[in-house]
UniProtKB/Swiss-Prot annotation:
One of its GO terms (molecular function) is ATP binding. GO terms for biological process: glycyl-tRNA aminoacylation. Substrate binds at R104, E175, F222, E223, Q224, M225, E226, E332, P333, A334, L335, G336. Catalyzes the attachment of glycine to tRNA(Gly). This is Glycine--tRNA ligase. It is found in: Cytoplasm. Its main location: cytoplasm. Homodimer. SUPFAM superfamilies: Class II aaRS ABD-related, Class II aaRS and biotin synthetases. It comes from Leptospira interrogans serogroup Icterohaemorrhagiae serovar Lai (strain 56601). ATP binds at residues 207-209, 217-222, 292-293, 336-339. The lineage of its organism: Bacteria, Pseudomonadati, Spirochaetota, Spirochaetia, Leptospirales. The gene is glyQS.
């Protein structure tokens, strides 16, 4: 119990700093909110954009074998029949008859019995365990009040069309991948790509989660960075290994996440998705325990074969070198943007005890992803210091998001930027007017040094 309370407390600290410093706000807050919806504030959206741009750089621009795509959220409903999502994209659901609370049965059993307990359990077995154990409802505390477990489809349904007579029942996409498969033939034709190659995209997906929880970790509306890598059948294991290593390296070397907070977990056969022959998750050690950050799945030729069958289109690839046609196999690294956001904030968060006995909260982001690259502080709002500060601000803004802050004591301004994760604070003082130098204070060590204004831009560029 103490461990759980400690985990809950540390997650609350993350939520608190995110709200206090404008990273994440509750959705629809002035109307009382809407459960499990969040808005990303000024610093949150900067962090998200930096993460997405860094991913696009290393998964598209720096690779000759990957191109980008932005496919529609709304697709012909037959797509989801073909992909298997209509019949297979389900979670087990139970209800409390007393308080009407809906609960995801497998996660509830694992909360009661331990992590991994529900892996591979059928609905019948879940019902048996729940009945025999006589668990209490976590909401009202009543025992013996659960309904039988049943499948609950996670796709959001909506209508397409202006009138009831002409409207078509469609779904908000639960993953971005299918839009890539639908455009495989188009991309091959227009870009003349040769296998092996990948198609990457960033976009919103929607899943009507039974138990959406843990801040932005599991939400009904979320963003994905997915890439489908098409390869010749028989080579998929080699590419699978390549992408697991490539993704892990990107997280540690580019994003700057500590290695001890990451691990690779291979899925058991019983927990594989219906389309996968093998999946490995890169997991992050969140405040609530280890959780999936990045799933790398070997989807075989399942999706392209299904779309061939349902659409009647030939989606085989013509290999001109080997003079043969085949349906490519696919390796998919799928990364949740919101989960990555929570991971980097959690990894960077620290409450540091200072020599004077005070505690400072600091987000130790890598400068590559920090929402603010540097902050400019005029020591006073007079004597030409604001004018000089504005000159420096205008010049440095070409390097990225630079913040100008002239409110309050310097010490309080430092603390505010520490909580935002700003790596460098630049103070313009009276010595600046004499010798054209500024004081640069580094976030992590809090060390300070004087830098000439005419060298400041290059100095900062080398560290970003």
């Amino acid at each position: 119990m103490e461990k759980k309370e400690s985990l809950d407390s540390s997650l609350k600290e993350i939520v608190s700093v995110c709200k206090r410093r404008g990273f994440v706000y509750p959705g629809s807050e002035i109307y009382g909110g809407l459960s499990n919806t969040f808005d990303y504030g000024p610093y949150g959206v900067e962090l998200l954009q930096n993460l997405k741009q860094l991913w696009w750089k290393y998964f598209v621009h720096l690779r000759e074998d990957i191109v980008g795509l932005d496919s529609s959220i709304l697709l012909n409903p037959k797509v989801w029949e073909a992909s298997g999502h209509v019949s297979n994209f389900n979670d087990p659901l139970i209800d409390c008859k007393n308080c009407k609370t809906r609960i995801r049965a497998d996660k509830f059993l694992e909360d009661q019995k331990g992590e991994g307990f529900a892996t591979g359990l059928t609905l019948e077995k879940m019902n048996q365990v729940i009945k025999e154990s006589n668990f209490a409802c976590p909401n009202c505390g009543q025992r013996g009040t659960f309904t039988e477990a049943r499948d609950f489809n996670l796709m959001f349904k909506t209508s397409h069309g202006a009138s009831a007579e002409d409207s078509l029942d469609i779904y908000l996409r639960p993953e971005t991948a299918q839009g890539i498969f639908l455009n495989f033939k188009n991309v091959v034709s227009t870009t003349r790509r040769k296998i092996p190659f990948g198609i990457a995209q960033i976009g919103k997906s929607f899943r009507n989660e039974i138990m959406a929880r843990q801040f932005v970790f599991r939400t009904r509306e979320f963003e994905q960075m997915e890439m489908e890598f098409f390869c010749e059948p028989g080579t998929q294991k080699e590419w699978f290994s390549h992408w697991v290593n490539y993704c892990m390296n990107w997280l540690t070397e580019q994003v700057g996440i500590k290695k001890e907070n990451l691990r690779v977990r291979e899925h058991e056969k019983e927990e594989l998705s219906f389309y996968s022959e093998g999946t490995s998750d890169i997991e992050f050690k969140y405040n609530f325990g280890w959780g999936e950050l990045w799933g790398i799945a070997s989807r075989t030729d399942y999706d392209l074969n299904q779309h061939q069958k349902f659409s009647g289109e030939d989606l085989k690839y013509q290999d001109q070198v080997q003079n043969k046609k085949y349906v490519p196999f696919v390796v998919e690294p799928a990364l949740g943007v919101n989960r990555l956001f929570l991971a980097v904030v959690t990894d960077a968060y620290e409450e540091e005890k200072l020599p004077d006995g005070e505690t400072r909260t600091v987000l130790r982001f890598s400068p590559k992803i920090a929402p603010v690259k540097a902050a400019i502080f005029p020591l006073m709002k007079k004597d030409g210091l604001p004018e000089k500060s504005r000159e420096i601000f205008a010049d440095l803004s070409k390097l990225g998001n630079i913040e100008y802050d002239d409110g309050g004591a310097i010490g309080k301004r430092y603390r505010r930027q520490d909580e935002i994760g700003t790596p460098f604070c630049i103070t313009v003082d009276y010595d600046t007017l004499k010798d054209d130098t500024v004081t640069v204070r580094e976030r992590d060590s809090m060390s300070q040094e004087r830098i000439a204004v005419n060298q400041l831009k290059n100095w900062l560029f080398e560290r970003l």
